[in-house]
From Swiss-Prot:
A single cellular component GO annotation: plasma membrane
Organism: Yersinia pestis
Keyword terms, alphabetized: Cell membrane, Membrane, Transmembrane, Transmembrane helix
Subcellular location: Cell membrane
Taxonomic placement: Bacteria, Pseudomonadati, Pseudomonadota, Gammaproteobacteria, Enterobacterales
Name the record gives this protein: Protein AaeX
Pfam families reported for this sequence: DUF1656
Main location: membrane
Amino acid sequence: MSLLPVMVIFGLSFPPIFLELLISLALFFVVRRILQPTGIYEFVWHPALFNTALYCCLFYLTSRLFS
């Protein structure tokens, strides 16, 4: 028996962190959509690495908000 509550959606069980991952993913798409027209990606050396770091920061902020 697990100590953490499990979300069950249509018979599929998800860990409690799943909601935080989805919220941070939605925030990531919004922030990326805002940053692309500003031209910030022209100053970034590696856009994929920047996107990964941005998602990690947003996930950290989201998880701190929920805890």
